[in-house]
Amino acid sequence: MFHCIPLWRCNRHVESIDKRHCSLLSVPEEIYRYSRSLEELLLDANQLRELPKPFFQLVKLRKLGLSDNEIQRLPPEIANFMQLVELDLSRNEIPEIPESISFCKALQVADFSGNPLTRLPESFPELQNLTCLSVNDISLQALPENIGNLFNLASLELRENLLTYLPESLTHLQRLEELDLGNNELYNLPETIGALFSLKDLWLDGNQLAEIPQEIGNMKNLLCLDVSENKLERLPEEISGLTSLTDLLVSQNLLEVLPDGIGNLKKLSVLKVDQNKLVHLTEAIGDCESLTELVLTENQLL
């Protein structure tokens, strides 16, 4: 059970307030008493519908949690939060992010997942301190062409959107370690995707991919590659270059053979190739000396 303690019982110099799961219909007025000291405000899982003007006087905020509410608008005054480092607005009813978000220069972690957004503001790539960005399940149709300006990004989650292509600048994200593009409408990948040398986890499941560019073999640090539920008829021989790979998931595709180069994946421990059209298995798979899980069900193996 959650107990929401009245703030007037607390010290006037308050740096953190946690009012999660308190059935709040509006932002408590007493919070504004601490505008000179408040750095962390957690109002997640309430029933908030709007953020009033006094809310944006909390200019010392460094962490703001507003997930799982019913907020219908993010006002341009969000620009006041110039010291904000973490922002969670996931699972609300916000239809757009104002261009003024670009003034939140200190922002490092942002989650806008589960809102009825169709686009990110053009100014968004100006948030160059961002390291983690989550925009899952928001009906996103395209990324800003200059998304590559977010050069400090380490994690980018774009799952369950309506993306049909990736801008070339995406491959400028040289510090990116996690990229989740699962359940979109991607038909192809840019050849330059192989330039994401720091990438460790790449999820491309549930798209419309018919092929993977051979340049993917340049991702020497990749640990997990998920391309299941696509329309792949072959894997490039260059996949042999993924020498750090531990998990390769290619279930539910149209593969008839696996490339011989798969035998070079000495660290591969999980290989899932179920629900394809395999008619035989390359002997090279015997060279995958770390393999502990091999799934081949629902193929046409003789």
Task: Label each residue range with its predicted role.
Residues 1-302:
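The feature captures the LRR N-terminal capping module
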